[in-house]
Amino acid sequence: MRVFIIKANEAHTANDFSLKDLPGTSGRIDLICRALNSAFHLSHSFRKNVRVYVTLLGPPDPPKSLRFEGPELKPKILNPDELSTAKIIGKALERGKDIKRKSTEEIKVLPGIYVSNMSFEDVIRVVIKRFPLYILEEDGKDITEVEFPKNNVAFVLGDHIGLSSEDLSFLESVGMKVSIGPKAYLTSHVIAYVNIYLDRLGIP
């Protein structure tokens, strides 16, 4: 299983955005839609070996964490169309209003899609119980020089704003920084690259 954890610094935590202007009204949920596309979709098939967590930290009710579970997801629900994915995120945020403030319980929204009030650190602590953690940063160890385990791997990365120094201090205490290159790449492109690289290594 491959896990991707995305910190979405400004992504809205309520279904209050316009589908006609996702970049301008949602805190860049459009970037999250593209990242999900890169995580799960192949040209003619769907990756069932991927799990994605997205922690949304924008207004009005942060944090909200979404979990997309590849083995349970149906391609017809999470399809490559950006607007339909944004609608699903909006639906999840609507359901998230039912969760008690300090609870970390997850609510199932659709097959393979869950919402919770977990913080970014909560998500990390859940993941590292079962997965070695790799932090995708430009100044990390070259990914081609890293010896990955043969089954479960987890990667954490930021959105267009990135990870803060406080985030990195915490993450480096529980994981290892790795890099796909010397420049800041789009979140969706980084996920696509990592998936392709793990495919080449034969890591499920």
UniProtKB/Swiss-Prot annotation:
Catalytic activity, reaction form: pseudouridine(54) in tRNA + S-adenosyl-L-methionine = N(1)-methylpseudouridine(54) in tRNA + S-adenosyl-L-homocysteine + H(+)
Keywords recorded for this protein, A-Z: Cytoplasm, Methyltransferase, S-adenosyl-L-methionine, Transferase, tRNA processing
One Pfam entry name: Methyltrn_RNA_2
Subcellular location: Cytoplasm
Domain of life from the UniProt record: Archaea
Gene Ontology biological process terms from the UniProt entry: tRNA methylation
GO cellular component terms, semicolon-separated: cytoplasm
SUPFAM superfamilies: alpha/beta knot
Predominant subcellular localization, coarse grouping: cytoplasm
Entries under InterPro entries matching the protein: Alpha/beta_knot_MTases (IPR029028), TrmY (IPR007158), tRNA_m1G_MTases_N (IPR029026)
Enzyme nomenclature, EC number: 2.1.1.257
Gene Ontology molecular function: any one: S-adenosylmethionine-dependent methyltransferase activity
Residues binding S-adenosyl-L-methionine, per UniProt: L136, G158
Enzyme class name: transferase
Task of the protein: Specifically catalyzes the N1-methylation of pseudouridine at position 54 (Psi54) in tRNAs.
Protein family (similarity comment): Belongs to the methyltransferase superfamily. TrmY family.
UniProt subunit comment: Homodimer.
Protein name as annotated: tRNA (pseudouridine(54)-N(1))-methyltransferase
Species whose genome carries this gene: Pyrococcus abyssi (strain GE5 / Orsay)
